[in-house]
Regions:
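Charged, alpha-helical interface segments at or near domain boundaries
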Residues: 47-49, 98, 114, 124-125
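Charge-rich, low-complexity segments
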Residues: 1-69, 75-83, 99-102, 133-143
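Short, well-ordered beta-strand segments in beta-rich or mixed alpha/beta enzyme
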Residues: 91-99
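Conserved short beta-strand edge segments in small beta-sheet-based binding/regulatory domains
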Residues: 113-145
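Residues at beta-strand starts and edge strands
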Residues: 37-41, 90-92, 118
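Helical (often loop-to-helix) elements that flank the catalytic cores of nucleotide-handling enzymes
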Residues: 102-117
Length: 145
């Protein structure tokens, strides 16, 4: 199975009417259908937001830095793959599908060890059918980039 780096971007709204940018990964059917990545892990970070609910410049830089580090650590041996991320309403969401939540947690702690504590919330759930991913894919339309 080859992991590509093809994504789409779409715009949505949260429950409060804030704009949310949705970035979804494409070409993941082999991974989804393999049955190996059954645990959906959602990481949420409430960031410093501007008047539109989007990250301030400094928060945006920090989010980008952390996102790349986490993604590299998780995807190096396909322990987990990031399937999508959402930005808006003062919160960044990263969605991963993983083989095991225990090892995911250990790696996440290793990646974040050099940093001060981040206000992260993490939720894990068995999602063998990748329902969240398929819901996110439904947001891709002719206006997506």
């Amino acid at each position: 199975m080859k992991l590509t780096d093809r994504w789409f971007t779409s715009i949505s709204e949260d429950k409060k009417g804030n704009i949310v940018f949705v970035n979804g990964r494409l070409e993941l059917d082999e991974f989804r259908l393999s049955g190996k990545l059954k645990i959906r892990i959602e990481i949420r970070w409430s960031y410093e937001a501007d008047e539109h609910g989007l990250p301030t410049e400094s928060a945006g830089k920090q989010i980008e830095e952390i996102e790349l580090l986490i993604r590299k650590a998780m995807e190096k041996d396909k322990l987990a793959i990031m399937t999508g991320n959402y930005t808006g309403g003062g919160t960044k969401y990263w969605v991963y599908y993983a083989r095991t939540e225990r090892v995911f947690g250990e790696r996440l702690n290793e990646v974040l060890a050099p940093y001060e504590t981040f206000p992260l919330e993490i939720e894990c759930e068995v999602d063998t059918d990748w329902e969240e991913y398929l819901d996110m894919l439904s947001m891709k339309d002719e206006n997506s980039i």
